[in-house]
Amino acid sequence: MEKTIEIDGKKVRFKTNGATPLRYKAQFGTDYFKEILKLAPLQKLQGDNQSITADDMQHLDFEVFYNISWIMAKTADPTIPEPLEWLEQFDVFPMAVVIPELQDLMLSSFQTTKKN
């Protein structure tokens, strides 16, 4: 699955595939699926109920989101630099915009395909 979104005036491609969880573990040393589960409070951003409480925010580890974003960008474009250098190219990395855009990609690793 692939998606292109605009961040800080730049078109950025994000992609997931079967190797995404293994690439994540190789880069960051932690399990991709466990890390995604840490972002569960973000599900509140889907649909009409788009509010996250201060308590939800306290339990979020935004480093996980930055890491997952980088893995998806690296999967789409193997030439991008290491995570910190990649993030430094953006003057802003608006979480409120990026998170909802990438949720489907994150969740695609958990979904099955429907058989006809």
Q: What is the meaning of each model-derived region?
A:
Residues M1-K11, D31-M57, E63, T75-N116:
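Charged interaction scaffolds used for protein-protein
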